[in-house]
Amino acid sequence: DGHARVSNYQSRFPRVDVEEILELDNVDYSTGHIDFPGTVVVRNAVLDGFQVRARGDIIIEKTVSNVFLKAEGDIILSGGSVTRNSGYIEAAGSIFARFAQSSSLLAGHGIYIQEVSMHSRLTAGQEIIVEEGRGEIIGGDVLAGQRLKARKLGTKMETGTRVTVGVDPDTFQKLREMDAQYEDQKKTYHRVLLHIQQIEESRKRGKASQEDEETEKRLRMVQQKLEKHLENLELQRERLIASINPVEGAEVEVREQVYPGVEISFGVGVRKYRVERRSLPG
């Protein structure tokens, strides 16, 4: 169904645009992957392994896991994200989520998390804000173009948490392309592992054919190549981040505590915290 809205277009008469909205109960085998020229609203869940692409926004009521989401607008996750490092979420605008755990989130503007980010890769062109509720960033790799705000960074367990701020637009675009390539290769890698696992299960049941054995050999070679490629992409990303010259006005604001194990980088300068801090020195 289309939703009407009045455009701010400057003319003698207001122009009415129709914004396409697709509303679904779930995204699963009954719907298949979704690629829609407007906004997609999912009232319940997106089943693991499925993709949702939208030229508008994506709004999902329940927690997402191993899914691929890409929107040219914003992404709103009412239930949060637990992608277990095998899903990928990208918005040209902003991402809003209740929490993120072992997730990869990339936003052109901002990432806004209500409760906590745990062991996640967060990348935003402008800002990352985790201030409501617990307001904690625990573990993971967090990169923001201009600013980061949180209540707490790290934990008393000295969980390694890396924060980088002050990324110029050109470098951010390179990181975005690199991350997209990494996630694409990782999806292929997981498919290869799944196929190998299926052959191993067939062998245990005594049903593996000679063709299966030959296929496994080829898959093992592909697995090794993909592992090296993924490792190389990670190294390239590390080098790119290490070469960043921070933009003017980049800032990190922590309202309560910075724990040991946290690294904060403004470009090439890295500050490591070995003792607990109740305020973040400038």
Regions found by a protein language model. Name each.
Residues 123-125:
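Conserved short secondary-structure elements within globular domains
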Residues 1-108, 113, 141, 151-152, ...:
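Charge-rich, low-hydrophobicity low-complexity segments
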